[in-house]
């Protein structure tokens, strides 16, 4: 009897293009307001125009790209007021999620967040900002998911997609990056202790400090 053949699944080209184009925008290789040159991006990413255009449309739904009627697309400009409003809401959402997570997160979920935290610490020690940021974003999302409220998690993901570039910019300051790592150490300690009151305060403070750094970075980039 022949063994069942498991199909080899590959990530669709437009999904790969989304990931790579998102990184270019978030990490500043493509600047806010910059027009997207399709020919250059196709060559850089090694893809045709069809998956690139699909990727651009998807990133437009995330708020990272702005579609221009009959003129292509551009990297979405950073708007300080909108960023401030979004991060203010996200601070409240993370505080609520932290409170819920302290009550009901499983041991496996806490262990997973601890593993991500330790990986993030290693990226910080190696001064790998891109790697640090990926771990950082995963930690924030895992804390929200550990709260066990899928509606909260879904809205959080949508909002976070709109501020990825700004959140990355905040840690371009070494002083802010150092402070953010210390804040995450305290957040991890409070979460593992299931100290809801302390964790909610720390998460709110962390997002407030992030907001101040974001607005400072946006002002300098203007």
Predicted regions and their residues:
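Short helix-capping and inter-helix turn/linker motifs at the boundaries of alpha-helical repeat units
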Residues: 12, 110-111, 177-178
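Conserved amphipathic alpha-helical segments that form helical-bundle/coiled-coil interaction surfaces
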Residues: 107-168, 182-188, 198-209
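Short amphipathic alpha-helical interaction/hinge segments
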Residues: 163-167, 171-174, 211-218
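Short linear motifs at protein or domain termini
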Residues: 1-103, 211-222
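Mobile beta-alpha loop/short-helix "lid" or hinge segments that flank ligand
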Residues: 60-66, 159-161, 176-178
């Amino acid at each position: 009897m022949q063994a069942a053949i498991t199909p080899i699944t590959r990530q669709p080209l437009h999904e790969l293009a989304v990931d790579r184009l998102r990184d270019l925008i978030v990490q500043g290789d493509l600047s806010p307001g910059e027009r997207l040159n399709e020919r250059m991006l196709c060559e850089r990413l090694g893809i045709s125009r069809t998956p690139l255009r699909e990727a651009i449309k998807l990133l437009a739904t995330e708020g990272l790209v702005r579609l221009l009627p009959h003129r292509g697309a551009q990297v979405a400009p950073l708007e300080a007021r909108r960023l401030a409003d979004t991060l203010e809401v996200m601070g409240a959402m993370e505080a609520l999620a932290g409170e819920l997570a302290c009550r009901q997160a499983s041991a496996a979920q806490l262990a997973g967040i601890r593993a991500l935290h330790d990986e993030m610490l290693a990226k910080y020690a190696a001064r790998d900002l891109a790697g640090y940021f990926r771990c950082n974003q995963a930690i924030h999302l895992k804390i929200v998911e550990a709260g066990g409220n899928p509606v909260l998690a879904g809205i959080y993901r949508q909002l976070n997609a709109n501020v990825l570039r700004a959140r990355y910019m905040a840690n371009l300051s070494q002083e802010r990056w150092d402070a953010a790592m210390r804040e995450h150490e305290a957040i991890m300690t409070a979460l593992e202790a299931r100290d809801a009151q302390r964790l909610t305060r720390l998460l709110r403070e962390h997002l407030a400090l992030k907001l101040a750094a974001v607005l400072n970075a946006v002002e300098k980039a203007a």
